[in-house]
């Protein structure tokens, strides 16, 4: 059956104490609403309607997509009123209502819920809690059939004793939702149009209300303040850590690992503490990542080693390559098989061939370095003249002496060597030694100045 999804994302979130709309606050590097939209897309609906209000333009700009239709709720008059704003755009056989501040909901849970909705049956996602304070209560009859949802503020003492709460996530037959929304009233403690009142209307019309529960109650946890936001973050990260460990990854401490994007992992991967993975990261078999590393949009081939306190972005490390500690690989960095980048080496838009080495204290920008070449400590590729960037190209088996400045554009042939302390401004032919430094002069009998 066809499906329309409505995501309610109009709330201000005053308890966040922020100029940023609540649904744009991030969990694992992505806005809460972004997580919900990604889950909605996984269900392959006919349309996704996003109801926005507070900070509407910010939300629209941040999350614009060809498959999203944004509907503005000018006044926040309740969840029923919010869904009503999307009514002109709903024509599918089923309508699923989601919330933009409930980022951990799983597509599998929603699939189970949707299997229970039909022309004569609604499907409601509920959760059983030890303390359901704040949740609307699920009122059932003697046969266990759902009769109504009573909001916490409107509930009697007996109703507040009910532990089964309403998550707000609801799937309804598309042919009936318009009729029910048109009959909503705001005669309640909040003076709002409650979407939950649809349940009692459906029961009165002879429809059955089926229920489903998530495997984990945290799936339906929202965030009204930064404390709850932090709880969502930590739960998301622990869930991600468990998934990685199930795929053969060793995490030294799952509580000190952050995934802020997507990662593909091989087997026998070792990740030490305080590692952050961002964007899209590919980690192949037998990779080792030391503590305190940040890796973004990068690929680590089989057996690569990232040592402590290294930062990688847009980089590729070949099989058996290693970098760090304290290495920085910026976008466009490519390390060949068994290449080595040591401490305090920065690379940008540069490639290091198979077996090549840059041991320490170097900047390699806009450079191509051939296989088995050795870059001495303190080497700088001078790639910028104040207006344009230029490349340095080295052949295979090149040896760059320590403290060399290579002024681009520059080509060094296979087997070329530069003497330590040289400033190289002209191309160096293959198998040639280049020296570009002042001649040393020793002054006999010289004495240091003394203070006066």
UniProtKB/Swiss-Prot annotation:
Q: Where is this region: Linker?
A: 227-247
Q: Where is this region: N-acetyltransferase?
A: 248-452
> From its record, what is one biological process in GO terms?
cell wall organization
- List residues binding acetyl-CoA: 377, 383-384, 402, 420, 437
According to its UniProt record, which reaction does this protein catalyse? alpha-D-glucosamine 1-phosphate + acetyl-CoA = N-acetyl-alpha-D-glucosamine 1-phosphate + CoA + H(+); N-acetyl-alpha-D-glucosamine 1-phosphate + UTP + H(+) = UDP-N-acetyl-alpha-D-glucosamine + diphosphate
Query: What does the entry list as the binding residues for UDP-N-acetyl-alpha-D-glucosamine?
Result: 8-11, 22, 73, 78-79, 99-101, 136, 151, 166, 224, 330, 348, 363, 374
Single annotated GO MF:
magnesium ion binding
In which family does this protein belong, per the annotation? In the N-terminal section; belongs to the N-acetylglucosamine-1-phosphate uridyltransferase family. In the C-terminal section; belongs to the transferase hexapeptide repeat family.
Q: What is this protein called?
A: Bifunctional protein GlmU
| This protein's encoding gene | glmU
């Amino acid at each position: 059956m066809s499906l329309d999804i409505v995501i309610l994302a109009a709330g201000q979130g005053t308890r966040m104490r922020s100029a940023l709309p609540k649904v744009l606050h991030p969990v694992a590097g992505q806005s809460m609403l972004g997580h919900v939209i990604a889950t909605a897309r996984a269900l392959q609906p006919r349309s996704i309607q996003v109801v926005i209000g507070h900070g509407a333009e910010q939300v629209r700009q941040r999350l614009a997509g060809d498959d999203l239709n944004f509907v503005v709720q000018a006044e926040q008059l309740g969840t029923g009123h919010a869904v009503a704003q999307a009514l002109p755009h709903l024509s599918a056989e089923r309508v699923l209502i989601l919330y933009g501040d409930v980022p951990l909901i799983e597509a599998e849970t929603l699939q189970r819920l949707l299997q229970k909705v039909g022309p004569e049956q609604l499907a409601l996602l509920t959760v059983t809690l030890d303390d359901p304070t704040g949740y609307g209560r699920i009122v059932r009859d003697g046969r266990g059939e759902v009769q109504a949802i009573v909001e916490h503020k409107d509930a009697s003492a007996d109703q507040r004793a009910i532990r089964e709460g309403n998550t707000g996530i609801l799937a309804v037959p598309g042919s009936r939702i318009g009729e029910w929304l048109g009959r909503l009233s705001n005669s309640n403690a909040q003076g709002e149009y409650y979407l939950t009142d649809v349940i009692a209307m459906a029961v009165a019309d002879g429809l059955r209300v089926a229920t489903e529960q998530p495997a984990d109650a945290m799936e339906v946890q929202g965030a009204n303040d930064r404390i709850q936001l932090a709880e969502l973050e930590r739960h998301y990260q622990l869930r991600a850590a468990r998934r990685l460990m199930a795929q053969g990854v060793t995490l030294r401490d799952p509580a000190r690992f952050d995934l802020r994007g997507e990662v593909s992992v091989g087997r026998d991967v070792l990740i030490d503490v305080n590692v952050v993975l961002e964007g899209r990261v590919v980690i192949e078999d037998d990779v080792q990542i030391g503590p305190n590393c940040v890796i973004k949009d990068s690929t680590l081939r089989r057996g690569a080693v990232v040592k402590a306190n290294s930062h990688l972005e847009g980089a590729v490390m070949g099989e058996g390559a290693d970098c760090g500690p304290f290495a920085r690989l910026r976008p466009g960095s490519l390390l060949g098989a068994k290449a080595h980048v040591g401490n305090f080496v920065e690379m940008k838009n540069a490639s290091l061939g198979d077996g090549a080495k840059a041991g320490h204290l170097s900047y390699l920008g806009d450079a191509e370095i051939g296989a088995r070449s050795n870059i001495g400590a303190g080497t700088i590729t001078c790639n910028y003249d104040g207006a344009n960037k230029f490349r340095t190209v080295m052949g295979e088996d090149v040896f760059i002496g320590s403290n060399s400045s290579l002024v681009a554009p520059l080509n060094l042939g296979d087997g070329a060597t530069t003497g330590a302390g040289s400033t190289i401004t002209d191309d160096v032919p293959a198998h040639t030694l280049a020296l570009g430094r002042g001649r040393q002069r020793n002054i006999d009998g010289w004495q240091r100045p003394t203070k006066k």
